[in-house]
Amino acid sequence: MARPKKCRQLSSCVPCSLFKPNGIPSVELTHIQLAADEFEALELGDVQRLSQLDAAALMGISRQTFGYLLASARKKVATAITQGQVLRLPSKTDKDLS
C-alpha cells in the first residue's frame, strides 16, 4: 500500500491549460497530464533556478521527493515536445492537492 501524499505548498499560477502541436486537432493527439506539483517543481527548479533543497523547503517536501517531481515533469515535457503530444497543464482546482 502506498504512503499518503504530504500536503504540498504550491504558489505558481498556470498561464494556460495546454500546449499542443500547431495545426492538428487536440482530439487526434495523445495527451500527457502535468500534475500541479510537477508544474511547481519545474517553476522553482528550472525557471527560478533554486537549489533542490531550497525548492523542496518552499514546497514543504523532502529534497528527494522534489527531485522525483522535477525528473517526472521534465520527462513529460520532453516527451510531449519530441513526440508531438498535447501537454495538459494543471487547472486552478488542481492546486488544492493534499
UniProtKB/Swiss-Prot annotation:
InterPro entries in the record: UPF0251, WH-like_DNA-bd_sf
HAMAP family per the UniProt record, alphabetical: UPF0251
Protein family according to the UniProt entry: Belongs to the UPF0251 family.
PANTHER family to which the protein is assigned, alphabetical: PTHR37478, UPF0251 PROTEIN TK0562 (PTHR37478:SF2)
UniProt protein name: UPF0251 protein Sputcn32_0687
